[in-house]
Amino acid sequence: MLTMGGLDVESVEPVAPAFDKIVVGRVLEVAKHPNADRLTLCKVDVGGGTTLAIVCGAPNVVAGMKAPVAMVGARLPDMEIKQVKVRGVESSGMLCSAKDLGLSQDHSGLLALPAEAQLGADVRRVLDLDDQLITLKLTPNRGDCLSLLGIAREVSILTGSPLAVPAVAPAKAALEEKRGILLQDTAACPRYCGRIIRGVDAKARTPDWMVRRLERCGLRSISAIVDIANFVMLELGQPLHAFDNRAIEGEVIVRRAREGERLKLINGQEVELAPDVLLIADRKKPLALGGVMGGEASAVSGSTVDVFLEAAWFNPSAVAGRARRFALSSDAAFRFERGVDFAATPEAIERATQLILDVCGGAAGPISEAVATLPQRKPVRLRSSRASKIIGVQFSDEQIAGLLKRLQLPHARSGGEFTVIPPSYRFDLEIEEDMVEEIARLHGYDNIPSRPPQAKFTMLPAAEGRRTLSELKRILVDREYFEVVNFSFVEAQWERDFCGNAEPIALENPIAAQLDVMRSSLMGSLVANLRFNLARKLDRVRVFEAARCFLRSSGGEDPRDPARALAGYHQPLRIGGLAYGPAAAEQWGVPVRPVDFYDVKGDVEALLFPREARFAPLAHPGLHPGRAASVSLGGAAIGWLGELHPRWQRKYDLPQAPVLFELDVAGLAAVNMPQYREISKFPPVIRDRSMEFDEGIPVSGILEELARNRPPLVQNIRLFDFYRGKGVERGKKSLAFRVVMQDTARTLTDAEADAAMAQLTELLAAKFGAKLRT
């Protein structure tokens, strides 16, 4: 039930293992064993006029004490009791320790039972051992369930049973004395209650029932006053603290710590405080870490006569993280970090006062209270239609109203809309989805039908004029590249070295000290991949990555561009690759040579095919000054390729320079649509022409000019030879072009072919000053 209600039950265990025939007995006489120094002979009254002779080895056995007696035939967790002789003396049973009963690991002596326990009564009933210990694994937002009251409230909600909260009558003030309270930090502590109780017996014995309940909740008994404070915390969820009233000088002050201030805590640890730590102090000194742990100097002890009892509400933000900073763990901090009911503070101090007066005696004064601005619970809107849509179950307005009533949430209704005022103990109810969750868990998660979502999908035809990222990746994989996936954050030094980026986009909270900036290029990550593989003895590496890079926006981007996802920043999707080592995998039929610029240029051209890119010399901080090129399509730059700069090759300990490229995916996606062209049935005419050009004229510019201004008969022009040397002037180069001419209607004559070649020669001479080489 609790698990399905949202409170995860981690385990349900009995508080004691199974055993029977264990009764309450009183030790009447204790005599020395005749044959053993460490054993005693005990006469034990087990009620009903029955007296047993039992041999016992416990050091704490004394006449008059009451202890558990295992009768002959009793079954304990580890043994069965029989009538036996112990060193020649008959023993009719066994006096038991807590370990014998499986209640704890304490085997130092007999388990002493309360003096009022009835002789012969079943120990399971006397110690309330037929109980179950339920361990809950609460989520951080359910701090309201860190108490018996909170769990009882949930059970009431889930079952519909009425919640019976024991009434706590205000203690009648037998004193007029009050201690002043000053709140210097009202945001961190807007409510503080305190009460003086004089004449307490600090050495009073904690009731057995309270000790048992504390132990079952994982708390050890310390002293009656401290035990009562802990018990009320478990019962109502409000942490309390008891000060020795004599240790407080003047009024109680809630303030921030001063730089360098120190406090010794009740666990013996001395801590140095910082100004963001909340303190409970008096006029002269700190007394406690607010909401975390008390100080040793002001703690109650066996000599305490007067107590100042504290109950306060601390803002979770003022307590969160403070215990961890000092390596502390306290139940109070655990609760205050998650949120405590700020309306229940007076009730908690009244309950603790009642128990202290009952157990320790004394006289209570009136409650001193300082209250500033308490948290205001903002109304939360809940629509029936919204709840039905999210949960997948149709709820009527009346059903929603009924569920809110069971949840004990005050609300106002207007049609199908409810305005809910979250109670003071529910800090987790802030938005409409929180309320929908409450409706769902109360309705029952197992009552929500399993309905797979249904949607109509229409397959859209793939655009012929665009390629997907998967297609681009497949091209590189076919060319022996392996895909890698790297972090988008890199070392700042990589950005400075490879990109010349002196001010990369810095991360506020990097996952590692060295990964502190966002990358503006894939280059650094690919070089890191290369070094990783070289360290593992690979001599041929081909890797690529398709990912976003991060740049500061220049302001000229299209606001509809998906790469401009955040104002002020540009996040283009790029594909980059790196090639290193032999151009081809080693095999007997191919000479071994290192990969070069032109090998990777071929890979880039394969990515762009059937479109033709323009490659132009490029100065790039990460690339070799003479072996780098920009890549343009349709007059727009889309990336670069080149060999790594020798400086970075040496710095990053690379035996040879890799060749890299990086292209914008947006520029690669578009492809030319195929155009129909009639296939000629007439033979082509093929002519070669060799021309001399100035050394500085790029071949790409020549080919582009020929493509733009070729005669209609020319179908294709291709460079097939390049020559420098004998017969060519210094500062000149010889380029040989193969020209294919063809007509779809007739066979070309030599005169027509000669005229077309002459036209091309004149074009090159006029545009580039080229001379026909004879």
PLM region spans:
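Terminal amphipathic helices with adjacent charged low-complexity linkers/tails
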Residues: 155-184, 360-387, 393-394, 435
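A carboxyl-terminal module marker
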Residues: 389, 406-412, 419, 428, ...
